[in-house]
Amino acid sequence: MKLGLCTWAYNRTFASGKMDLEKLLHVCAEELKIGGMDIIDVHLKSQDLDYLLKIKKLATDLQITISAVSPGNSFGKDKREDEKAEVEKIRQWTDTAYILGAPNLRIFAGWAPKERHKELWPKVVNSIKECAKYAAKKGVILAIESHNGGGYLPTSVETFKLLKDVNSPWVKLNLDTGNYQDADMYAALKASMPYATHMHCKIHELSEDGRELQFDFNRIFTILKEANYRGFFNIEYEGKEDELAFVPKSFEMVRRFIKKYDMF
């Protein structure tokens, strides 16, 4: 298994102006000493070719793999032109992932009022199918992330249905260890492992002695071990504490479990 960072872990630090992508690449290499990063769209200053090549060159020089690029999107729009715009957005971000050398593009199914999910579902499926055809030409996997907060994919049930309905080898999962709302989140994670091309390691609350207080990491690592997961496991700290202090603490905690479960 490969340990990396999701740039969202430093989102508040980015917003304050104290962090940018170039600086964070150096932090990953020199302080966190990790080999991978997935980049949230808002943390890229632009999609201009010269800038993207600059980021790719710096990442390569620092021996950092850009494991995924993660735009925000939401399919299932009422207006045809709005849905086409979402598809075009994902096509453009597929190009960005290709330029950066990222094998995965994290996408969402989207959000809509729960009472409209069934009605809008075919639009979501068709749009992802269209995006997958384009991604296949670029050799980029669309890694769908189940997300809470009223999305189409609150649980593994809807997530598996989407994978079945889209039915593309270029569509897999960006499996987040903290997003499923199933009654048994750990059973859902275990069932999802065969479809995971990339993962987010969610950290919400760390104790002063470095324990995650909301998630059972022994159960999570047992699932990872049994699945023989070898992809990137990128830490996404979403706690309320200072990111500059608690992201490194998150890596210390996860490294203890990597050692305990012999997941090097």
Residue ranges with predicted function:
Residues 97-117, 138-147:
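Active-site groove signature of glycoside hydrolases
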Residues 40, 108, 202, 236:
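Conserved residues at the C-terminal ends of beta-strands
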Residues 30, 36-37, 67-69, 126-222:
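Acidic/histidine-rich catalytic cores of soluble enzymes
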Residues 232-239:
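Short acidic/histidine-rich active-site segments
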Residues 64, 102-103, 140, 227-231:
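A short helix->loop->beta-strand "cap" motif at the edges of active sites that frequently abuts
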Residues 1-99, 136, 168, 172, ...:
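N-terminal pre-domain/capping segments
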Residues 33-34, 97, 102, 196, ...:
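A structural motif
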Residues 19-23, 51-54, 83-91, 120-128, ...:
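Charged helix-capping and loop-helix junction motifs
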